[in-house]
Design a protein with these regions (language model features):
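A short glycine/serine-rich beta->alpha loop
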Residues: 105-110, 239-245
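ATP-dependent carboxylate-amine ligase catalytic core
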Residues: 16-18, 22-37, 62-148, 164-166, ...
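Aromatic/hydrophobic pocket-lining residues that form π-stacking "cages" and hydrophobic walls in ligand
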Residues: 56, 120, 198, 202
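Class I S-adenosyl-L-methionine
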Residues: 11, 61, 102, 199, ...
Length: 250
């Protein structure tokens, strides 16, 4: 089977496209014994996830780190969801990992997103990466990506999205996204006016909360920008290649 065959197979496995919960995907992940050598950064949020992942990848790569990135959805080809050392992986490289997931799942039913997420995580775990960057697909708390205990969690923004699955207001949705936070680890919130539920979750579990406008901030003019936070300041920074007024916030 090639990658297209596996993707078609994944579409037929589960009775519904979205099935919130981690029990099934966690059971298969345990059988796969997924383990990353370096730190993992997980990014959630209504908007800005993809841009944040791209800029993290660029910064870390420029600093000499070997990166792995998982984002979704893709624009044209499925393999766009996975990059290693800045390059999109070849379709053929993913096939053995789809086979691994198929063997590990046995009788466990997985959605398309759960199956494909596990396959990409399996590939990234085999690549001896310095840093792994994971983009949440939907929400955070019950997203398949959240089976990985990340070393740093980022919530870019919280707005009304996927309300049928995440809730009808920012407070409820915010708590879902804050589900990626971990005790004692950095939890970065770049929404300038985050829901109280996001802040409460960080305090509740003892995460190291970094809040825009409190723990860090930025300023810019027509030619350059600066960042400051917790006793550090970086000035004279060049604007990112990604254009838009919101990109400095990302």
């Amino acid at each position: 089977m090639n990658l297209d065959d596996w993707l078609a197979h994944c579409e037929r496995l589960h009775p519904v496209a979205i099935d919130m919960g981690l029990a099934r995907v966690q059971a298969v992940a345990d059988r796969l014994a997924l383990k990353f050598e370096g730190p993992v950064i997980t990014v959630a949020g209504t908007n800005g996830k993809g841009s944040t992942c791209a800029m993290l990848e660029a910064i870390l790569s420029e600093a000499g780190y070997r990166t792995g990135v998982y984002t979704s959805p893709h624009l044209v080809h499925f393999e766009e969801r996975c990059r290693v050392a800045g390059e999109i992986v070849e379709p053929e490289a993913l096939v053995p990992h789809f086979e691994r997931v198929a063997q590990a799942r046995e009788d466990v039913s997985l959605t398309y997103f759960e199956f494909t997420t596990l396959a990409i995580l399996s590939l990234l775990a085999d690549k001896q990466l310095d840093v792994v960057i994971l983009e949440v697909g939907l929400g955070g708390r019950l997203d398949a990506v959240n089976i990985i205990d990340s070393d740093c969690a980022i919530v870019t923004s919280v707005d009304l999205d996927h309300m049928a699955y995440l809730g009808n207001d920012r407070e409820t949705i915010g708590r879902e996204k804050a589900g990626i936070f971990r005790t004692g680890r950095p939890a970065i919130v770049s929404d300038p006016v985050p829901p109280q539920s996001v802040l409460d979750r960080a305090v509740e579990i003892g995460a190291d909360l970094w809040r825009m406008g409190h723990d860090f901030n930025y300023a810019g003019d027509k030619q350059q920008w600066s960042w400051s936070g917790r006793g550090r300041r970086y000035s004279g920074l060049a604007y990112p290649a990604l254009r838009g007024a919101n990109q400095l916030m990302n």
